[in-house]
């Protein structure tokens, strides 16, 4: 038999140690054995796991934050799942509840009275206070300048913060006699207590979670509203769009090494055989409702009903989410952390060609635009989700992924005539995805199988999502590698058939088939070049042929080409001239869009408007720099962009993509979702 692996669980009390040893005795005979390691505190456990003296422990959000910091760098590998009315979930939302009829907004909170669940609690303290510090509403210079409680006492006129002992003002609004009213478990503590404090008129705002009003006063729900970060108010049920942060469930953390699979197979097995609804006399979780605090929440929270595996790419920062992560960061800040870069925009550039263009833009914009350089679009989406970069212009396929990751479209590129430009577009601009073949071939949409294909890149709209979505609907198979005999789809696995025709940059073998301008056949022009030199069909957009024939493209491969050398494939099996794309196309799709985090959207919209006045097609400074044009392929923006079109505030990525396209990408992504999409789907499902 193969040697058994041991998983060393870290415990922080004798009650936990006892439960852990009992679990060891009840374990189903598995290839994994359990040993229990007791430490004094969760921080000692984090250190022990980091030093390879233990393997795993389940922690709450604030502790997951610490475990993820250097030097420990632990990552969440499984999330606890809790039951809620309407299904199971792995998170809740922190909200600010106010009475309807009071007319103040988030910016008017200074001098108001406030109700909190308790000092140091997520929804009641860490998130609201961290957020107000992050927004620079509460002025606090960090630990050096005194404890954050003093800064909060200066901000609100009076509060009830159960457990606060340093500042009298922070429990002035609490209920009870002088001795007990400030206690952690006083009458106004917890979610229902903080809500009662608002109800009794002791506070103007209560910081609670999204279910609190429903659980305490369902029939009075209409008398309350939520304060949103964007400066508006919304009904109590709109907590998904009007919350201060999503609070992640407790998570099991571990070192980022090969042991993760063993820990998960051990956890999955135990949760299955010893979890809720099993006949075992040992309970892995709970049961809930224990009276003795010493016996509560041992190893896992009592309210957990199961564990859910966390996708590979997830780290603590993605797991906790931007709002929660920044709130905790703001509460722990010392002098070293930088304040928010309010009037700058951190643009995300991909590869060295975009870097040099972005650096020039940064110089001419007097530093209003700064650049973050990464290897591909996916890395940029992660960076923006984490708040370490602000914006990037993406193809619709990536707008989908970015949307699932919580980013929103801010402006769209427009390529048609300039009449579109002056209009404030409610509707995004569109283009057509087409399939182009050589006129001399006998190929139709119905006999494409086994031919040689050329794609702009995996995951992009015209080059991949549309044609492969249609093929997927037709064949029902996810084996795209088998459909064409060979091809070039930059971003495919290096040994796949769909990298066979790719060329790289000619300088570096490792660059063959990469999804960036380092691959000759990347993008629209690249895919057309691949058709001319090697392929049978190219999946591009309606204008690509016109942009590269009759001398428009001076490169050797395009010499002598005319429109008449090519035809379009229609989905009904017919063929058409390349100018007939309005009647013969694979789909009508939205243009590229700049995406950003929702709370940055307006800032970026304004900033881009200003930049376009200077460096756009008719910019006053376009001799110095042109933001849409570039020497090589489409850098930062598509080169044909005539202008950026403002999208209406609050537009969702689904609306931007349109039903037809959204459905096609969603269906395609059931096949093999990228690691990033798995992470964001996990977070979106919460």
UniProtKB/Swiss-Prot annotation:
Keywords: Disulfide bond, Glycoprotein, Ion transport, Iron, Iron transport, Metal-binding, Repeat, Secreted, Transport. SUPFAM superfamilies: Periplasmic binding protein-like II (SSF53850). InterPro entries: Transferrin (IPR016357), Transferrin-like_dom (IPR001156), Transferrin_Fe_BS (IPR018195). Residues 7-333, 345-670 form the Transferrin-like domain. Residues 333-341 are annotated as: Connecting region. Glycans are attached at residues 473, 548. Disulfide bonds join 10-45, 20-36, 115-197, 160-174, 171-182, 228-242, 348-380, 358-371, 405-680, 421-643, 454-530, 478-671, 488-502, 499-513, 570-584. Its main location: secreted. GO terms for molecular function: metal ion binding. GO terms for cellular component: early endosome; extracellular space; plasma membrane; recycling endosome. One of its GO terms (biological process) is antibacterial humoral response. It is found in: Secreted. Pfam families: Transferrin (PF00405). Transferrins are iron binding transport proteins which can bind two Fe(3+) ions in association with the binding of an anion, usually bicarbonate. It is responsible for the transport of iron from sites of absorption and heme degradation to those of storage and utilization. Serum transferrin may also have a further role in stimulating cell proliferation. Ovotransferrin has a bacteriostatic function. Its concentration in avian egg is the highest concentration of any transferrin in vivo. Belongs to the transferrin family. Monomer. This is Ovotransferrin. It comes from Anas platyrhynchos.
